[in-house]
């Protein structure tokens, strides 16, 4: 078991480094509106200058993290988003094995745009997973008029997060695809309970946020990744992604490494790609420590025996 990390453009890395039908699953939290994670806007977020990121007012004296606005996309921004996810869909469709699943975190406002591009790339939509989580996103009073319109919210407070679930078409029947490619299905939570589309995990624990914050390459500017996902959630998804507990999971937008850490903790193999210098360095530093976090996923009956059957990355090359 192990992981390979690449610093660069995900689409270029996949094209140059990975063959067709070589990846078993994709689990990723891509740039939500794409425009938020352009270099200039990430720098504004880090400097707390706002821009397309909203810098929330303090709440009971507590400083709140910057949040993507999501509602500021122009027609040209939307076209960029469509082109981005069209390229993403085509890239992962090429490297995925037949029957390989794709788990994609998205937002209520944009998931229809993302879904359409994945459809057109030849992937099959299987479900929308619902992550229950109370966030500080949405529910805000009008910008610059908090007191004047104190009983007005610009949009609902978001209490759930959608994850699109897609699959590359099977090679024959499901059992044929499992036999040939080790893909096509989802790992059950137990013999009695299948994987479900209602996800627990809730808010990212403070201990995990601190791990990532401390992994920042510049101690004077240390801050956790703005969309850090909890290990419980990511291990739940990564456990489901490999039905036979064998294979390689790809995260082409790994951020500070939560997916890669989850895969590593489960004893699977992973490939992570990240374009941003700071996030890549954070991932390198944070992954080993995030992988040491305990979650309920490791208590499942099939977890202990999995280590005996684990393979290395080279077995799938």
PLM regions: where:
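Glycine-centered, small-residue-biased loops immediately flanking beta-strands
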Residues: 100
């Amino acid at each position: 078991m192990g992981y390979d990390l690449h610093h660069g453009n995900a689409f270029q890395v996949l094209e140059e480094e990975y063959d067709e039908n070589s990846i078993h699953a994709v689990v990723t939290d891509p740039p939500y509106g794409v425009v938020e994670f352009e270099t200039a806007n990430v720098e504004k977020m880090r400097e707390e200058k706002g821009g397309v990121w909203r810098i929330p007012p303090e709440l009971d004296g507590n400083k709140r993290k910057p949040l993507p606005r999501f509602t500021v996309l122009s027609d040209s921004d939307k076209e960029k988003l469509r082109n981005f996810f069209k390229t993403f869909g085509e890239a992962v469709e090429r490297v995925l094995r037949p029957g390989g699943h794709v788990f994609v975190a998205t937002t209520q406002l944009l998931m229809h745009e993302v879904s359409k591009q994945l459809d057109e790339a030849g992937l099959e939509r299987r479900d929308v997973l619902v992550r229950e989580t109370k966030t500080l996103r949405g529910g805000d009073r009008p910008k610059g008029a908090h007191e004047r319109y104190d009983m007005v919210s610009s949009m609902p407070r978001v209490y759930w997060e959608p994850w699109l679930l897609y699959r590359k078409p099977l090679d024959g029947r499901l059992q044929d695809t499992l036999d040939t490619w080790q893909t096509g299905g989802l790992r059950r939570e137990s013999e009695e309970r299948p994987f479900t589309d209602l996800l627990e995990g809730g808010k990212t624990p403070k201990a995990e946020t601190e791990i990532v914050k401390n992994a920042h390459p510049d101690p004077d500017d240390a801050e956790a990744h703005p969309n850090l996902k909890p290990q419980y959630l990511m291990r739940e998804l990564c456990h489901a992604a490999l039905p036979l507990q064998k294979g390689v999971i790809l995260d082409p937008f790994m951020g500070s490494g939560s997916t890669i850490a989850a895969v590593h903790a489960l004893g699977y193999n992973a490939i992570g790609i990240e374009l941003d210098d700071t996030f890549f360095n954070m991932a390198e530093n944070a992954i080993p420590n995030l992988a040491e976090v305990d979650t309920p996923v490791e208590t499942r009956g099939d977890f202990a025996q999995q280590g005996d059957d684990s393979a290395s990355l080279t077995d799938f090359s």
